[in-house]
Curated annotation (Swiss-Prot):
One GO term describing the cellular component: 3-isopropylmalate dehydratase complex
Name this polypeptide is given: 3-isopropylmalate dehydratase small subunit
Functional summary from the UniProt entry: Catalyzes the isomerization between 2-isopropylmalate and 3-isopropylmalate, via the formation of 2-isopropylmaleate.
Organism for this UniProt entry: Sphingopyxis alaskensis (strain DSM 13593 / LMG 18877 / RB2256)
InterPro entries hit by this protein: 3-IsopropMal_deHydase_ssu, Aconitase/3IPM_dehydase_swvl, AconitaseA/IPMdHydase_ssu_swvl, IPMI_Swivel, LeuD
Highest classification ranks of the organism: Bacteria, Pseudomonadati, Pseudomonadota, Alphaproteobacteria, Sphingomonadales
């Protein structure tokens, strides 16, 4: 997973409430186990409109998405985070998220920032013409107009994003400790080695 510390760029000013995982990635895209290409299906129903935000040149490579309340609600599908990541989104800013989506986002290198609605409204206004900057280390969202918003994040999630650690790489970090534990168990209970094989 690519580490995330600072992200700056255009933000897609979606602003819609209750965007569920079926809107983020429709069910017919869930037949794959690979992340590559999932961005093509991201927000498919919204992208049917020829004037949709996602395909406008100014937002095509945007690393930030600004959404409304309850983003990522609905069914639990990690494919939603895969689709956002494949679309190039590294940060989603919204007033609230589904707990499952929020966890899946972090596990896939996407920072879910929670800000109050007044801050969202200001960022939607700025995003129409100017970039937004997110600094995870300092937990801030800033604009070129001296707007500065702070956000909270669980320290463990913050560490995982800053270091680019998913569940596998986090476990691999403890490889030496796991090996030492297994060696100690083998010495304390040699009969277990024979049972396990």
């Amino acid at each position: 997973m690519t580490p995330l510390n600072q992200v700056e760029g255009r933000a897609i000013p979606l602003g819609l409430k209750n965007i569920d995982t079926d809107v983020i990635i429709p069910a017919h895209w869930l037949k794959t186990t690979t992340r590559e290409g999932m961005g093509r299906g991201a927000f498919e129903s919204l992208r049917a409109d020829p004037d949709n935000l996602f395909d406008r040149p100014e937002y095509r490579q945007a690393p930030i998405l600004i959404a409304g309340d309850n983003f990522g609600c609905g069914s639990s599908r990690e494919h939603a985070a895969w689709a956002l990541g494949d679309l190039g989104i590294r940060v989603v800013i919204a007033p609230s998220y589904s707990d499952i989506f929020s966890g899946n986002a972090v596990k896939n290198g996407i920072l879910p920032v929670v800000l109050p609605q007044a801050a969202i409204d200001r960022l939607l206004e700025v995003a129409a013409t100017d970039p937004v900057r997110i600094d995870l280390e300092h937990q801030t969202v800033t604009t070129p107009f001296q707007d500065r918003f702070t956000f909270e994040i669980d320290p463990f999630r913050k560490m995982c994003l800053l270091e680019g650690l998913d569940e596998i790489s986090l476990t691999e970090k403890s490889d030496a400790a796991i090996g030492a534990y297994e060696d100690r168990l083998d010495a304390e209970r040699p009969w277990m080695r024979a049972v396990v094989g």
